[in-house]
């Protein structure tokens, strides 16, 4: 039963990927297979969570992503602490750090620190009221820095 506590996180990440697909209907960003876009996602998922998430990424890439020219590349950065350290090193431009990913898993304290550095995008314009109902209200409130 331990893996059940991770299900909401995997579902939230899946919802985020589906929102990427939905964005084109609200404000046409011009996605096209002729002009492909690559989205990088960093997680701390391992084991079953990583397998489930990678299956969602593969499904997205072979369906909506393929149709719209969006490729998602996901990578696990080990533990939550490892991921936090890697994201912060990237945001701070430390020597040897990888380029900042487009999307990453983060707890509120890390997200807040990155927001203070100007590294967090406001997704409010991309979530309709209907979209918001798919999430647990506390998750949305915790991630609202305004």
Where on the chain are the PLM-derived regions?
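Secondary-structure boundary motif
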Residues: 25, 62-66, 89-96, 116, ...
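Hinge/lid segment of periplasmic solute-binding proteins
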Residues: 106-146
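Short, low-complexity disordered leader/linker segments with a strong preference
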Residues: 1-39, 62, 129
């Amino acid at each position: 039963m331990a893996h059940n506590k991770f299900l909401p996180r995997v579902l939230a990440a899946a919802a985020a990927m589906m929102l990427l697909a939905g964005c084109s209907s609200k404000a046409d960003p011009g996605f096209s297979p002729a002009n492909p876009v690559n989205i990088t996602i960093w997680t701390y998922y391992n084991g079953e969570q990583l397998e489930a998430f990678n299956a969602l990424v593969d499904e997205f890439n072979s369906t909506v992503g393929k149709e719209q020219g969006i490729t998602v590349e996901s990578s696990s950065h080990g533990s939550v602490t490892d991921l936090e350290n890697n994201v912060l090193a990237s945001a701070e431009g430390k020597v040897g750090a990888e380029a900042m990913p487009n999307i990453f898993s983060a707890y509120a304290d890390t997200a807040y620190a990155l927001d203070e550095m100007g590294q967090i995008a406001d997704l409010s314009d991309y979530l309709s009221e209907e979209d918001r109902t798919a999430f647990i209200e506390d998750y949305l409130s915790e991630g609202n820095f305004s």
